[in-house]
Regions:
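Ligand-binding pockets and gating/stacking loops
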Residues: 1-267
Length: 267
């Protein structure tokens, strides 16, 4: 975490940068307004209280899971309730988990899916060709999958029951797919030709599967969508019109989604 003293130092550094000519422009002042709002939110009693998971019932904590992933997902929901508008849940194993069976090394590991080797074993995944690199390659599927299924389903179910999904868009996303075939190291490498994402809330219909791949899961056979379409879908859900553009210094216009089209089945 970030202590109060370090947080204050960063605020002072930001204040010193705000004396620049760029900061005094209309765009810079608008950005400063957003920053001040974010700082007020971070230091508000509601946001501070959101980090206290002991305020939740035993049943809710059990439903999310008492492991680190469950705590992160539950915290995400509490931050939304506290008024935080954009929340990213990035699950990183904390150092206090070191030494537990099936877990990683000195600094903890990302509970991620970058599994190039040993994804079906019981211990931590190694690096390519057996060289241990757990800080990158994380934990194997037998450790990852049960906690993910439990925590993500709990998040969607809990937010729905609380009415939070009515005006909150939940996106479960990765940067790429994985190779349809297991490599010689017992893992799967990067694959950009097919991947899956999940949406919930903000008017998205539940229980729908959009698109399809071949029997190997390697190539899209129905309803091919691009990252630009994904981005445009989010902007449209947020009420940002397709014609909206950002402007760089010097007046250069930047398209938000580079011509992407919203995924029509989600509207």
């Amino acid at each position: 975490g970030l202590g109060r003293e370090r947080f204050s130092e960063r605020q002072h550094l930001l204040d010193s940068l705000d004396d620049s000519a760029v900061a005094q422009s209309s765009g810079g002042q608008a950005m400063r307004s957003h920053t001040e709002h974010a700082l007020d939110l971070l230091t508000s009693p509601a946001a501070q209280s959101a980090f206290d998971l002991s305020k939740e019932s035993e049943a809710i904590r059990d439903r999310y899971g008492r492991d680190h992933r469950g705590h992160c997902y539950l915290l995400g929901r509490r931050l939304i309730e506290a008024g935080v508008r954009f929340v990213t849940v990035t699950v990183i194993q904390p150092p206090e988990h070191v030494g537990r069976p099936g877990y990683g090394q000195t600094n903890g590991v990302f509970l991620n899916w970058d599994h190039h080797e040993g994804i079906y074993q019981n211990g931590p995944c190694g690096g390519p060709q057996g060289n241990s690199n757990q800080e990158r390659y994380g934990l194997p599927h037998p450790v990852m999958m049960p906690s993910l299924d439990r925590s993500f389903s709990a998040l969607v179910e809990d937010m729905d029951q609380r009415g939070l999904l009515d005006d909150t868009l939940v996106c479960f996303v990765t940067e790429m797919g994985r190779t349809p075939k297991v490599n010689k190291h017992g893992g799967r490498d990067h694959w950009s030709r097919a991947m899956s994402i999940a949406f919930a809330g903000a008017g998205c219909p539940g229980g729908a599967v959009i698109g399809a791949t071949d029997k190997h899961g390697g190539d899209v056979t129905e309803r091919l969508y691009t990252p630009y379409d994904y981005a445009e879908t989010i902007y449209r859900k947020l009420g940002i019109p397709e014609s909206r553009r950002l402007e760089k210094p010097g007046g250069v216009a930047v398209n938000l989604s580079d011509g992407g089209k919203p995924i029509r089945e989600l509207f």
